[in-house]
């Protein structure tokens, strides 16, 4: 199948399923099961419930899709996990 035949949708991850699969609520209102694309696995991009994602689907099977992109959070300060514990000191060579 040529890449021109694939359809892209945006949606919201509602549930994480076993085997790197996700239940995704599309913006159009449909709910599908999507799996993580190989490049996302290779680059260790983690997807959590509540993330906005882009899904690639075949026009022949509109119940399954491939998760190809996780959108960055629009929340302020969402640039990483918060650190816990005391602040670190400066690095000193011996």
UniProtKB/Swiss-Prot annotation:
Domain S1-like intervals: 1-72
Record field: transmembrane: none
GO cellular component term of the entry, any: cytosol
Gene3D superfamilies with a match to the protein in the record: Nucleic acid-binding proteins
Cited PROSITE patterns: S1_IF1_TYPE
Gene Ontology molecular functions: ribosome binding; rRNA binding; translation initiation factor activity
One Pfam family here: eIF-1a
Keyword list, A-Z: Cytoplasm, Initiation factor, Protein biosynthesis, RNA-binding, rRNA-binding
Statement: the UniProt record of this protein carries the keyword Cytoplasm: yes
Region (Disordered): 71-94
SUPFAM superfamilies xref list: Nucleic acid-binding proteins
InterPro entries membership: NA-bd_OB-fold (IPR012340), RNA-binding_domain_S1_IF1 (IPR006196), TIF_IF1 (IPR004368)
Chain segments annotated as coiled-coil in the UniProt record: none
Subcellular location field: Cytoplasm
Family matches, as NCBIfam families: infA
Function: One of the essential components for the initiation of protein synthesis. Stabilizes the binding of IF-2 and IF-3 on the 30S subunit to which N-formylmethionyl-tRNA(fMet) subsequently binds. Helps modulate mRNA selection, yielding the 30S pre-initiation complex (PIC). Upon addition of the 50S ribosomal subunit IF-1, IF-2 and IF-3 are released leaving the mature 70S translation initiation complex.
Family under the similarity heading: Belongs to the IF-1 family.
Known partners and oligomeric status: Component of the 30S ribosomal translation pre-initiation complex which assembles on the 30S ribosome in the order IF-2 and IF-3, IF-1 and N-formylmethionyl-tRNA(fMet); mRNA recruitment can occur at any time during PIC assembly.
Protein name per its UniProtKB record: Translation initiation factor IF-1
């Amino acid at each position: 199948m040529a890449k021109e035949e694939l359809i892209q949708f945006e949606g919201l991850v509602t549930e994480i399923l076993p085997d790197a699969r996700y239940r995704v609520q599309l913006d159009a209102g449909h709910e599908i099961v999507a799996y993580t694309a190989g490049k996302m696995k290779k680059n260790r991009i983690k997807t959590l419930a509540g993330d906005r994602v882009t899904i690639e689907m075949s026009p022949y099977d509109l119940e399954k899709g491939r998760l190809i992109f996780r959108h960055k959070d629009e929340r302020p300060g969402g640039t990483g996990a918060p650190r816990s514990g005391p602040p670190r000191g400066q690095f000193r060579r011996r």
